[in-house]
């Protein structure tokens, strides 16, 4: 009987990571043991430690989901000319990227979401690093678009800084995602998921201070949906 096919060190390392991701995503950092990962990867504990010195090191490696996604979005964001319309588009993109499947992400996106939520409950490192990458990716074009909206009179002055408004919108999108992360949503909004997202975006951009006139002029969901091709 032929033996198992030999694989090189990089392939073995990737196999371990692929085995670890769904375990961390489904059971959290604390609920997953090195033995669980070794068993799922079909390797011994000793061989696993040859590639990773600790469970924490494997957890850190899994952050590569955002390493794949964010640089691509950043390159395309930097091509956008800051304006009120782009400010609305960026926040629309937040909701669409968080609530709907990112093309080409496959299972990685769902695992990333579960890892993020588990991280908020226990080992905060994954969430902190992931959210920091998001902020670094979007901060410059968001800041310039806020300034453009203020200069155009499209946004009212609020006693809330831009960074907080940025995060408030993101947290609303994350909260909606959390309520729908299982196959059965936690709430029945009595509308389609697409309409729910569009209503949430409207609620969010109104909340950050955009005027009715600016929203009426620039908040065109069908156009914004088409503009998503600019990012992906």
Where are the regions that the model predicts?
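Hydrophobic alpha-helical connector segments
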Residues: 61, 74-111, 159-162, 166, ...
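Amphipathic, non-transmembrane alpha-helical scaffold segments
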Residues: 17, 63, 128-139, 194-197
């Amino acid at each position: 009987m032929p033996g198992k096919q030999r694989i090189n060190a990089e392939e073995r390392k990737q196999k371990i990571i692929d085995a670890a991701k769904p375990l961390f995503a489904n059971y959290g950092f604390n609920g997953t043991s090195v033995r669980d990962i070794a068993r799922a990867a079909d390797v011994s504990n000793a061989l696993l430690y040859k590639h990773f010195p600790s469970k924490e090191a494997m957890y850190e490696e899994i952050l590569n989901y955002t390493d794949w996604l964010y640089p691509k979005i950043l390159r395309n964001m930097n091509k956008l000319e800051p304006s009120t319309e782009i400010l609305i588009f960026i926040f629309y993109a937040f909701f669409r990227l968080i609530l709907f499947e990112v093309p080409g992400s496959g299972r990685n996106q769902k695992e990333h979401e579960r890892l993020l939520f588990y991280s908020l409950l226990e080992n905060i490192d994954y969430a902190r690093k992931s959210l920091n990458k998001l902020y670094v990716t979007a901060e410059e074009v968001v800041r310039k678009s806020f300034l453009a909206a203020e200069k155009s009179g499209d946004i009212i002055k609020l006693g809330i800084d831009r960074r907080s408004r940025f995060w408030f919108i993101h947290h609303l999108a994350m909260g909606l995602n959390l309520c729908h992360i299982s196959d059965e949503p936690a709430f029945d909004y009595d509308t389609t998921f697409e309409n729910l997202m569009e209503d949430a975006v409207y609620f969010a951009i109104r909340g950050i201070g955009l005027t009715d006139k600016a929203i009426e002029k620039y908040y065109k969901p069908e156009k914004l949906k088409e503009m998503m091709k600019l990012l992906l």
